């Protein structure tokens, strides 16, 4: 039988096949091979009934996220709050870099718009991201049609209202929500488990909130590929390995000078590039000491 893992709990894997969910375990040979089944995996399994089955094999994955481990994702809704906590373009771009690198389609959702006096600033931000090619939503009415026939994960900084949004989309989930701590300005983690839920003709998964995010991109080329607007422009740079920092005849810097590239995104790119280089230097020093 074939199916997809929709939940994992205490060593059991719940596999959905033709609308029926089977409780299964992984064969011991998975541990010997260093393989671990994850939510989202397509698997071959055997089962005598719905409560006692075994996973026999795992199909190749198209992508994966580490925190939490979840695989074969179509798209991700990145929830950013307009206020409390304040909108943070740097953090949003970290999420977008990760998703671009993983080849997961991003959807940007802005929460807590009611806390703003007006939408002038956030409308300007929306226009910039839409010009790059990103889908940008203000309401669940805009978001809901995008969920059909997709596996969607929800992610974002703690306190941005992920669980609140999911409870509005699917009240039957009854996810716990946490308020912002006045002393820390951060939300309490309220999401503890990862499961797929059938919502609006698609499958969604909630993921634990992040107060920070480390992306897996570790070189300039992959970073460039993870910024769509830089990726498009880089074909016109004189040097194929252009980092868009000091090289002559750089199409990215020319676009920036002409106002065709958003300065905020370019500054974040430079910061991420610097972080990559610093990590590399730190790694070299550690290796040298050994």
Curated annotation (Swiss-Prot):
Compartment annotation: Cytoplasm
Membrane-spanning intervals of the chain: none
Domain CP-type G: 62-213
Enzyme Commission no: 3.6.1.-
A GO biological process held by the record: ribosomal small subunit biogenesis
Cofactor(s) needed for function: Zn(2+)
Main subcellular location: cytoplasm
Cystine connections: none
InterPro entries: G_CP_dom (IPR030378), NA-bd_OB-fold (IPR012340), P-loop_NTPase (IPR027417), Ribosome_biogen_GTPase_RsgA (IPR004881), RsgA_GTPase_dom (IPR010914), RsgA_N (IPR031944)
Hydrolase keyword on record: yes
Database matches in Pfam families: RsgA_GTPase, RsgA_N
Gene3D superfamilies with a match to the protein in the record: Nucleic acid-binding proteins, P-loop containing nucleotide triphosphate hydrolases, Probable gtpase engc, domain 3
GO cellular component terms, semicolon-separated: cytoplasm
GO molecular function per UniProt: GTP binding; GTPase activity; metal ion binding; rRNA binding
Cofactor binding summary note: Binds 1 zinc ion per subunit.
Keyword Phosphoprotein: no
The organism's place on the tree of life at top rank: Bacteria
Top-tier EC class: hydrolase
Assembly mode: Monomer. Associates with 30S ribosomal subunit, binds 16S rRNA.
Function statement: One of several proteins that assist in the late maturation steps of the functional core of the 30S ribosomal subunit. Helps release RbfA from mature subunits. May play a role in the assembly of ribosomal proteins into the subunit. Circularly permuted GTPase that catalyzes slow GTP hydrolysis, GTPase activity is stimulated by the 30S ribosomal subunit.
Family membership: Belongs to the TRAFAC class YlqF/YawG GTPase family. RsgA subfamily.
NCBIfam families: ribosome small subunit-dependent GTPase A (TIGR00157)
Protein name: Small ribosomal subunit biogenesis GTPase RsgA
Upper taxonomic lineage: Bacteria, Bacillati, Bacillota, Bacilli, Lactobacillales
């Amino acid at each position: 039988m074939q199916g997809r893992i929709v939940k994992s709990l205490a060593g059991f894997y719940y596999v959905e096949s033709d609308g029926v969910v089977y409780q299964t375990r992984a064969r011991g040979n998975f541990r010997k091979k260093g393989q671990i089944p994850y939510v989202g995996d397509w698997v071959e399994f055997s089962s005598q009934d719905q409560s006692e089955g075994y996973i026999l094999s795992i199909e190749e994955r198209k992508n994966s996220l580490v925190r939490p481990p979840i695989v074969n994702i179509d798209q991700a809704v990145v929830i950013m709050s307009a206020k409390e906590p304040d909108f943070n373009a740097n953090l949003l771009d970290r999420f977008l870099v990760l998703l671009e690198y993983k080849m997961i389609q991003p959807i940007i959702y802005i929460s807590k718009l009611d806390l703003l006096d007006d939408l002038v600033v956030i409308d300007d931000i929306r226009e910039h991201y839409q010009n790059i090619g990103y889908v940008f939503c203000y309401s669940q009415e805009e978001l809901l049609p995008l969920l059909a026939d997709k596996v969607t994960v929800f992610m974002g900084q703690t306190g941005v209202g992920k669980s609140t949004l999911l409870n509005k989309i699917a009240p039957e989930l009854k996810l716990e929500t946490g308020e912002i701590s006045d002393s820390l300005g951060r939300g309490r983690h309220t999401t503890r488990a990862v499961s797929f839920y059938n919502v609006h003709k698609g499958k969604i998964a909630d993921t634990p909130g992040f107060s920070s995010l480390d992306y897996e991109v570790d070189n300039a080329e992959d970073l460039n590929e993870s910024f769509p607007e830089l990726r498009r422009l880089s074909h016109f740079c004189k040097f194929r390995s252009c980092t868009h920092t000091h090289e002559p005849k750089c199409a990215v810097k020319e676009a920036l000078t002409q106002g065709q590239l958003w300065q905020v995104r370019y500054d974040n790119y430079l910061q991420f590039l610097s972080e990559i280089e610093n990590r590399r230097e730190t790694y070299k020093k550690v290796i040298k000491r050994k």
